[in-house]
Every structure is written in structure tokens, then in C-alpha cells.
Amino acid sequence: MTDTLRIGTYNIHKGLSSFSVRMVLHDQRELIRSLGVDIMFLQEVRGKHDRHSRLFTGGQYEFLADSIWQSFAYGKNAVRSNTDHGNAILSKYPIVQWENEDISAHPTEERGLLHCEIEVPGWDVNLHCICVHLGLLGSWRHQQLIALENRIKSMVPEGAPLIIAGDFNDWRQKAGNTLAADLGLKEVFEHTMGKPARSFPSVLPFFRLDRIYTRGFDIKHTKIHSGPRFANTSDHAALTADLRKL
């Protein structure tokens, strides 16, 4: 039985470098492996891309999962003529159920909530994980946070451990008010550092866009993964947190 988890979140920018100059998916895979996480929340993941099909078979999430994270789920949100992208969750433990809920607030910006139930050995209840990538406008994010709140209240048992992570695009830092007050969630960097992590742009992080919210855990350690290695592989820094189940 394990009562501790390391989890991470990372917007991989569709497998492209910070300024979309080159494909860096192989580098991203090595960086994600180096984080040592049990569960990884990913945003801007391509499910397919006709031009890149010769580089790897299947979606980017399968390539990144490789043999390390043997269970994974992909929520397709945006579909174009030759490609699609969305959110993904990679897990070392079995994903026993998952659903992708459309929370798009505008036809030009498709968004979703990827909700997975994960069976962690020795736990008496399943772990609920929700990967999010919220909209660019405040009014859109407001609608999407309401959808997130409604889903949690209706689909997540009150005593079940819960992790919500991803790119909240919340540069005005308003999401936490809803999630903390109404749902009893803690943002891990607020807990350890007093404020959410600066995660964007990765070359010199300033904006606090990416978040990890938890319920039912003791937050042991948090880390922002930026610097040259990460700046060369995405426009976002990666975040990790070590958690112990209460």
C-alpha cells in the first residue's frame, strides 16, 4: 500500500518548442520522466497529426506514456482537418473509469474537463483526478469553473481524495476563491509558498497560470520546474507536488 503520490502538471504546447520552432516531443518525454511522478496531468496534447505520423504512432499521450505510465486517458477537445488536441492524464495506477466533459464557452475555443477515477493499491476509495485547460477570457473561465464545481458536487463522493490540475489561464487569480470556498480545495503552492506558482512564460516565469488543487491530502513538497531545459521544450513550466493521503 502507498499513501504518498507525486503528481505533476505540464502544458506541452502540442509538442513544440516555446516559439513553435521545432518538434520537441522526445525532449519532453525525457523531462517528464525525470520528474518521477506517479500521475501526470497534460494540456495541449495532440491525439493525432497527419504530418507527424511518421515520427510516432498513436497520439502524443501514448508516446509520452511509453512503458512508465501504463494507464492513460485522452480527452479530445479541438478537432481540425488533419489534427486534434486536448488534455491527457498518465498514471502508473489503473484508470478504471474516465469521461471528457465539453465545457467550451465559445465556438472558437474548445475546452474540456478530463475526469479519471484511479485505483491506487490499498486505498479504500478511488482517487478522482480532473485535468483542465480553461479559456482565455475571464467570462469564459467563470462559466467553466461553474461547470467544474457542478461536476465535482455531482460526480465526486464527499470523502473521496481529489486532485484538479492544469492550465487555468487564471492570471487574475480568481479561480481559487471559488474552489477553496465552495469545494474545500487547497492549491498546493498557495499552501507552501503563499501564492500560486509563476509558470508562464517558462523562459522567465511571471504569470501564475498553472495550478494544482487537492482535497483529502497533506501537501508535503512542491516544485516549479523551469530554467533552460524546460524553456526549450514548452512555453509553460512544469509543476510537481508530493502528497500524502489523509
Residue ranges and their predicted role:
Residues S17-R22, G47-G58:
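Short, flexible/disordered intra-domain loops and linkers
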Residues H52, G59-I68:
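Glycosyltransferases and closely related glycan-assembly transferases
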Residues M1-I39, D66-S67, S71-Y74, R80-L246:
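Active-site regions of metal-assisted phosphoester/phosphodiester hydrolases
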Residues L55-Y61, K186-E190:
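Secondary-structure junction/capping motif
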Residues L42-R46:
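Acidic/histidine-rich, surface-exposed loop or edge segments in extracytoplasmic proteins
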